[in-house]
């Protein structure tokens, strides 16, 4: 499982463009990614702040999302809108969430170059204080 909370700050004046991209990515992701558990966007209380919650059956399913055609097409557009972004790996509390624990995975040995690159760039960060993974 992989669950991420993205903290996003948008460049001033780019909010409408960012929201339009999100409105394209959301349905495309839900329609084409069978291992997607949760994916949504929220406006924060501070101007230009947004949050995205992403949850997948596995870390490699998250990487498949990142390397999907619709995400790769949107990435340059997103880059023009995003001023800053921090990915926070979060761990669902068992018994208080329907999502399983966040786990890290390595890319398969036969992974294509983009998948291997993204698996390293976005490697899951498992906090020391989280319960041990079975």
PLM feature spans:
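Short, well-ordered beta-strand segments in beta-rich or mixed alpha/beta enzyme
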Residues: 2-9, 38-68, 88-89, 100-108
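Short, surface-exposed ligand-recognition loops at beta-strand->loop->(often short) alpha-helix junctions
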Residues: 9-20
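Short alpha-helical
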Residues: 13, 47, 73
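An amphipathic, aromatic/His-enriched active-site/gating alpha helix that lines ligand/cofactor pockets
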Residues: 24-37, 55-90, 115, 119-134
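A short acidic, often aromatic-flanked loop/helix-cap motif at beta-alpha or helix-coil junctions
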Residues: 93-98
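Surface-exposed beta-loop interaction hotspot
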Residues: 108-111, 125
């Amino acid at each position: 499982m992989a669950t991420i909370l993205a903290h996003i700050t948008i460049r001033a004046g780019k909010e409408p463009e960012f929201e339009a991209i999100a409105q394209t990515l959301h349905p495309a992701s839900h329609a084409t990614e069978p291992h997607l558990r949760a994916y949504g966007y929220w406006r924060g209380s501070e101007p230009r702040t947004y949050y995205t919650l992403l949850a997948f059956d596995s870390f490699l399913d998250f990487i498949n999302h990142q390397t999907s055609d619709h995400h790769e097409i949107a990435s340059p557009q997103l880059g023009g809108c995003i001023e800053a972004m921090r990915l926070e790996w979060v761990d669902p509390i068992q018994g208080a969430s329907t999502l399983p624990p966040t786990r890290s995975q390595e890319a398969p040995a036969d992974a294509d170059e983009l998948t291997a690159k993204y698996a390293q760039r976005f490697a899951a960060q498992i906090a020391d204080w989280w319960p041990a993974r079975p």
